[in-house]
A protein has these predicted regions:
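NTP/phosphate- and nucleic-acid-binding module
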Residues: 339
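Core catalytic ATP-binding domain of two-component histidine kinases
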Residues: 230, 275-279, 283-285, 294
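Residue register of alpha-helical TPR repeats
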Residues: 29, 72, 110-115, 119, ...
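Intrinsically disordered, low-complexity acidic/Ser/Thr-rich segments used as protein-protein interaction/activation
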Residues: 19, 27, 106-108, 142-158, ...
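Intrinsically disordered or compositionally simple regulatory linkers and C-terminal tails
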Residues: 409-416
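Acidic, glycine-rich loop-and-beta core segments that form the ion-binding/anion-interacting portion
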Residues: 194-267
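Inter-helical turn/loop elements of alpha-helical hairpins
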Residues: 1-140, 163, 167-180, 208-221, ...
């Protein structure tokens, strides 16, 4: 019997006790224990987890409970909305957490609240603000103390900060710094010993950056390892995340109908738990795979759904790439729409520039350089691409950076 199955009956038995603060205090503790047990077993956004957190919040709002219990409940509710890609709700709770913990004299509380805020800022496309917020969180980090708190917080919150900081650095083009943080995450994971933390930070600190960098072979290998680990350790939520990243990587490597079907199935399985975080990326990857097998209409429909998701969720971090892929669809359709493609690439470029998403900006600029005047000189392309390349630190192993550099030197051929 799982811990969650043990706690639930105890919550029900509380109602046989006499009314009063002692009963409410016990009930609050049991709801929190129930929610904490459900996180690795069921996921962050399932109805059972949310019900336990909401019940705990109602007791807290009646005046019962400690500061620690309040921050744990707020953190759980913020994470549930964040994983469900309800970014406005997650942001509101994260700001409540920051306001609350700024009045406390506890670095662990402050780290938890600033980490929550920084992760929401990242997925809403506020990369610079996210990095600043996550650096504030990191300043509160005590690796030994927070490692011991992994069981109370669900995962090691300090190590999670490093993962989110890594993402923000990648988007801002600080690739050498991001590589150093990635190595730090891997080093700390080796001796951690807390399965939910190992699963979570392997996905977010190793696999996610590989996906974003297009390192499909490494991602496939590490995702398969994560799925096996999560099955052994019963970390259900990240077994699903690993299955999703595995299917995504395989569709990148070989966009066959079979791999695309498996990818769609993995997305549906994730949605069944209430998790939608990262959907804009996965829809974009699915559209790219569909383009790879000539399913242009299906790719266009997938992108349409992705834009609707962005509008509904507030998840804007991959918006520039959705516009870029829209341009590619317009170029690939039976009657290529050059003007429509240019408009889409410009939207991608402008969106990425506003977000300071340097790699997205570079990809959009590369498409514009290819599309523009097919007789453009290397000098013309340098004027477009070099200012972006100049602010990207490192990345020589990345295909998008290599292709842009090749375009500026006239080495990469523009195919009509």
């Amino acid at each position: 019997m799982s811990e969650g199955e043990l706690v639930a009956p105890r919550v029900a038995l509380v109602h046989h006790l006499a009314q009063g603060s002692d009963r409410l205090s016990l009930e609050l503790s049991l709801h929190l224990a129930h929610a904490n047990a459900l996180l690795p077993l069921k996921g962050y956004s399932t109805s059972e987890t949310l019900a336990a957190l909401i019940a705990a919040k109602q007791i807290l709002d009646s005046g019962i409970g400690s500061d620690l219990q309040r921050i744990l409940v707020l953190h759980g509710l913020c994470t549930a909305n964040y994983v469900a890609a309800k970014m406005n709700a997650a942001l509101e709770i994260a700001l409540q957490m920051v306001e609350f913990t700024d009045r406390q004299n506890d670095p662990a509380f402050r780290l938890l609240s600033y980490r929550a805020l920084g992760s929401v800022q990242y997925f809403t496309g506020q990369y610079r603000q996210a990095l600043e917020t996550l650096r504030l969180a990191e300043g509160c980090r005590d690796p030994i103390k927070l490692k011991l708190l992994s069981y109370r917080f669900g995962i090691d919150p300090g190590l999670a900060v490093l993962c989110y900081k890594l993402w923000a650095m990648m988007e801002l083009g600080l690739l050498d710094q991001a590589k150093q943080v990635a190595e730090q995450v891997k080093a700390e994971l080796k001796d951690h010993g807390h399965p939910p933390t190992i699963a979570t930070c392997t996905f977010f600190g190793v696999i996610w950056p590989e996906l974003l960098s297009g390192k499909a072979e490494e991602c496939e290998r590490h995702s398969a390892d994560l799925v096996a680990y999560c099955a052994e350790k019963k970390v259900a939520q990240f077994r699903l995340w690993g299955t999703l990243s595995l299917a995504c990587a395989r569709s990148m490597l070989k966009p066959t109908p079979e791999n695309i079907t498996a990818f769609r199935d993995a997305i549906r399985a994730q949605h069944a738990t209430g998790a939608h975080l990262g959907d804009s990326f996965f829809f974009a990857s699915l559209a790219a795979a569909l383009l790879g097998v000539g399913e242009v209409s299906e790719a266009a429909l997938t992108l349409q759904g992705a834009f609707e998701f962005v509008e509904q969720s507030g998840e804007r971090w991959w918006l520039a790439e959705l516009y870029r892929l829209t341009g590619l669809v317009k170029l690939t359709q039976a009657e290529p729409d050059m003007e429509g493609a240019e408009t889409a690439f410009l939207r991608a470029f402008e969106t990425a520039r506003q977000q300071e998403a340097r790699l997205h900006e570079l990809r959009a600029a590369t498409e514009l350089a290819k599309l523009g005047d097919r007789n453009a000189t290397s000098r013309d392309r340098r004027m477009l691409l070099e200012p972006i390349l100049d602010v990207i630190e490192g990345g020589e192993e990345r295909r998008d950076v290599r292709d842009a550099r090749a375009l500026t030197s006239g080495v990469l051929t523009i195919v009509s």
